[in-house]
Amino acid sequence: MAFSSLSPLPMKSLDISRSSSSVSRSPYHFQRYLLRRLQLSSRSNLEIKDSSNTREGCCSSAESNTWKRILSAAMAAAVIASSSGVPAMAELNRFEADTRGEFGIGSAAQYGSADLSKTVHSNENFRRANFTSADMRESDFSGSTFNGAYLEKAVAYKANFSGADLSDTLMDRMVLNEANLTNAVLVRSVLTRSDLGGAKIEGADFSDAVIDLLQKQALCKYATGTNPLTGVDTRKSLGCGNSRRNAYGSPSSPLLSAPPQRLLGRDGFCDEKTGLCDVK
């Protein structure tokens, strides 16, 4: 009786083979569809078995367990067979590695604490790369792209960054003594607590860069040239000779470059006792 109830299962599988192409072209959707049909098939077969047991009363609980194991094995085999067309995770990871970086828009290379001294990496793409605490002494990075890269605490003594794109980079606490920044673009870069003593900055663009006040004053003593890419004068990008002080101050030294503070009372008016009410 148990074997006679197996006949509906091949009939269902034939229906699946004919209609699978119309349900979905994706192997994943076909797998879900196949599982659903198998579940419905198992339910119908169990109902048939229950009705036959009611009529004849010849099937025991052992036969019922055997029938369930047969259905489970059939469903497992169907799942394994249908999953052969689904791309493996290894293939997806390989595709992501080929695109490089976050959403394929950068190198995301890792050079943290790496020894890159006296190496040549000119005209390369280091966008969003990590150079934290890297040794970059006397290396050649001319013409390379560092847009959005991390260079905190890197040592770049006498390194060549001429013509490089260093915009939007984090370069705080860097050692850039005697580094070559000729015609480099450092727009919106963060250079707080970095040492640029003796650096070559002819034609460099420091527009909206965050630089310590004392470091900026030292660079303004010999800043010259115009950046060939942005057309911005180096002295103008540093704010050299500007009589107008920054109203907000520099993040590294707000009290030195910002206007004197006006102390307000609890009601929002200036406290005459402070002596700062007449400050303009």
Curated annotation (Swiss-Prot):
Transit peptide, UniProt annotation: 1-59, 60-90
Location of the Pentapeptide repeat domain: 124-163, 169-208
Listed GO CC annotations: chloroplast; chloroplast thylakoid; chloroplast thylakoid lumen; chloroplast thylakoid membrane; extracellular region; thylakoid
UniProt main location, coarse: plastid
Entry keyword set: Chloroplast, Plastid, Repeat, Thylakoid, Transit peptide
InterPro entries per UniProt: 5peptide_repeat (IPR001646), Thylakoid_lumenal_pentapeptide (IPR053285)
Annotated transmembrane regions: none
Cell location: Plastid, Chloroplast thylakoid lumen
Quaternary assembly: Interacts with thioredoxin. Interacts in vitro with LTO1.
Function: Pentapeptide repeat protein of unknown function. Subject to degradation when reduced.
Protein name: Thylakoid lumenal protein TL20.3, chloroplastic
